[in-house]
UniProtKB/Swiss-Prot annotation:
Residues 329-448 are annotated as: Domain IV, binds dsDNA. The gene is dnaA1. Residues 76-111 are annotated as: Domain II. This is Chromosomal replication initiator protein DnaA 1. The keyword Transferase does not apply. It comes from Protochlamydia amoebophila (strain UWE25). Belongs to the DnaA family. One of its GO terms (molecular function) is ATP binding.
Length: 448
């Protein structure tokens, strides 16, 4: 039975966590939760979808135990029920068109969403947790959370998986919204065809008026193509003005793309999220999941061995599983460390490590902290530049076998400036978990 006392306890919990998360996170994940029932043994919460349950338990389990009943195992005693779907009220500019019209009007660039790329089978870890949370926020509330959402990271880390997951979720849960998923190359080809067929106006109308969600993969292919960039930039502006959701992926952050300041500004106007290289435990989880999909059993020790030697991206791990699967099925073999060493010999070989340079460190720091290399080399003292600059100096001292005087010269600073930066970062790292993770991401990017 729901009492005012129960409601007060839940309100106190919300007030407590509100001070520990951003307003956007609170609005997306916590505000929609309703207390339905409560006893001394269990609380029933109504949630809009399974992602909210996952977010709540992943981030606030200890806090929930402090406010709500706990079960015999010390876990929060909560029963979750999914709220019945509500009818989506579409703004006037989100007019609907029939499927026959869609077929007739949709350009050839539409990418079919990969059915295997869904939130449910995306393996989450520290380096991609933020990206997944942001993507789920966008999928839950298209056009209202982060717009545009810009996801960047290296090749084969799961950017396309997340992009297609957003598309699937919106199509299944916001059925009246029209989703268009394209690669940048496909958009360019579509525009070329439209110019050739003298149907540019029709293409512009489609992209700017008849789409509610635009998912764009690999925006880096727009570099050095000024006319195409201009067209896509106008499309972004038109969609943003009418409240449509835009999600973009790239192999580098907006600040490092060779695009106009105007286009970069639009991309940086929403949320920029970095997807890093998965750490060892996540790579092992990915391996085990991919193997399970193929009916393979990989002993935990062997999975760790593979993950320790293949760490650049997820795609390489998938390739390793495919090769092992073929050998095991064709030759009727069990997976052992010896078989892995023999079968994946070329994949496990590590290229000789080049000497790490200050330039490498600066580029990696710039990518993770979303600043320009030129700013890191400059003298600006604003916090958003000064902190990453000090991180670069700290990592240079850690990773490069040079004297402080030589490192100072590389940064255009004195050796005492380098020393001060290192001491400052060492002090901050002791208490700042976010900074520790960011430094870890930079280090992994450099070492890989």
């Amino acid at each position: 039975m729901l009492t005012s006392e129960t409601q007060n306890v839940w309100t106190q919990f919300l007030q407590f966590v509100k001070t520990r998360c951003s307003p956007a996170a609170f609005g997306n994940w916590l505000a929609p939760i309703r207390v339905i029932d409560c006893s001394t043994e269990e609380v029933t919460l109504e949630i809009p979808n399974i992602f909210v349950q996952e977010y709540l338990l992943s981030n606030y389990k200890k806090d929930l135990c402090a406010f709500l009943p706990v079960d015999m195992s010390g876990e929060p005693a909560i029963r979750f029920i999914i709220a019945p779907p509500q009818k989506k009220i579409i703004p006037p500019n989100h007019f609907s068109i029939s499927s026959s019209q869609k077929e007739e009007q949709s350009p050839n660039s539409d990418v079919k969403l990969n059915n295997n790329y869904r939130f449910e089978n995306f393996i989450e870890g520290p380096t991609n947790q933020f990206v997944k949370s942001a993507a789920m926020g966008v999928a839950l509330r298209p056009g209202q959370s982060y717009n545009p959402l810009f996801i960047h990271g290296g090749v084969g880390l799961g950017k396309t998986h997340i992009l297609h997951s957003i598309g699937h979720y919106i199509k299944e849960n916001h059925k009246k919204l029209r989703v268009q998923c394209i690669t940048t190359e496909a958009f360019i080809n579509d525009l070329v065809d439209s110019l050739r067929n003298k149907s540019v106006d029709r293409m512009k109308k489609f992209y700017r008026s008849e789409i509610d969600v635009l998912l764009v993969d690999d925006i880096q292919f727009l570099q050095n193509r000024l006319n195409f960039e201009e067209e896509l930039s106008y499309t972004f502006e038109a969609l943003k003005n009418k409240g449509a959701q835009i999600v973009i992926t790239s192999d580098k952050p907006p600040s490092l793309l060779k695009l106009s300041e105007r286009t970069i500004g639009k991309m940086e106007g929403g949320l920029v999220a970095h997807m890093g290289i998965p750490e060892l435990e996540t790579r092992v989880a990915i391996l085990q999941y991919k193997a399970e999909q193929k009916g393979l059993h990989i002993p935990h020790k062997v999975a760790f061995f593979i993950a320790e030697h293949i760490h650049n991206n997820v795609r390489q791990l998938e390739g390793a599983i495919n090769r092992l699967s073929a050998h095991c099925r064709l030759l009727d073999l069990n997976i052992t460390e010896e078989l892995v060493s023999r079968t994946l010999r070329e994949m496990l070989q590590q290229a000789p490590r080049e000497k790490i340079s200050v330039e490498q460190i600066l580029k990696s720091v710039a990518a993770v902290f979303q600043v320009r290399v030129s700013d890191l080399r400059g003298s600006t003292r604003t916090k958003d530049i000064a902190l990453p600059r000090q991180v670069a100096m700290y990592l240079a001292k850690e990773m490069i076998n040079e004297s402080l005087i030589m490192l100072g010269a590389s940064f255009g600073k004195t050796h005492s400036t380098i020393l001060h930066a290192c001491k400052n970062i060492e002090k901050k790292v002791a208490s700042d978990e976010t900074l520790r993770r960011q430094i870890g991401m930079v280090r992994r990017n450099i070492e890989s």
